[in-house]
Regions:
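Conserved ATPase-coupling elements of RecA-like P-loop NTPase cores
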Residues: 105-106, 159-163
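Conserved G1/Walker A P-loop phosphate-binding module
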Residues: 2-118
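Inter-motif core of Ras-like GTPase G domains
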Residues: 111-156
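Short secondary-structure boundary/capping elements
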Residues: 2-3, 14, 129-133, 165-166
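Conserved nucleotide-binding/hydrolysis micro-motifs of P-loop NTPases
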Residues: 100-102, 154-157
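Flexible loop/turn segments at secondary-structure boundaries
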Residues: 29-30, 157-159
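P-loop NTPase catalytic core
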Residues: 79-85, 94-96, 134-140, 149-155, ...
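Conserved small/polar residues in nucleotide/adenosyl-binding loops
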Residues: 167-173
């Protein structure tokens, strides 16, 4: 089946909304993927000047190294962008970024006392950062995505030795 036909079928079943949930381990390039996808496949097709500038401002931060950059799920752009796929086919597109599953060697989820505790919209009390990241990632896929995209890495882009083997082992737990 052709990609356009698949998207058309999905959009038909979802009232024209196609939300791409981007998940995977922390520091694997999820935010970088979203930023690049938006720059190449979405922003050029936004006709309204103010909406285009707003979408650019809403792009996620990305960076090199071991520090976790995304600390909560985020819809990008905040409001879905209507895109004309052909004469009779419009879709509303937005991506959903998430923290991702914590991997050993990543920085930012622990402090001097151990794993940081954070407040989330899903629990009344604070929970461990890694648990919040796991819950948020699961919610992105189960509750907010039409299509799920899994980003993985061999660890070479984030300077975390053994990122693949650790992530691979955790995935099988």
């Amino acid at each position: 089946m052709e990609t356009k036909n698949i998207l058309h079928d999905i959009a038909k079943r979802c009232d024209g909304d196609i939300y791409l949930g981007v998940v995977g381990p922390v520091r694997s390039g999820k935010s970088s993927f979203i930023k690049r996808f938006m720059e190449m496949a979405v922003i050029p097709y936004i006709e309204d000047k103010d909406a285009k500038l707003r979408a650019i401002d809403e792009l996620p931060q990305s960076g090199k190294g071991k520090m976790i950059m995304t600390v909560e799920p985020k819809f990008i752009p905040n409001q879905a962008v209507e895109m004309l796929m052909d004469e009779n086919f419009k879709v509303n597109v937005r991506l959903v970024d998430c923290v991702g599953y914590v991997i050993e060697g990543a920085k930012g989820y622990q402090d001097d006392q151990g794993i940081r505790y954070v407040k989330t919209p899903w629990y009344l009390e604070s929970i461990p950062f890694d648990q919040a990241a796991k819950v948020g990632t699961k919610k992105v896929i189960q509750d907010h995505s039409t299509i799920g995209i899994v980003i993985t890495s061999d660890g070479s882009i984030c300077d975390i030795p053994g990122a693949v083997s650790y992530t691979h082992l955790r995935a099988h737990e």
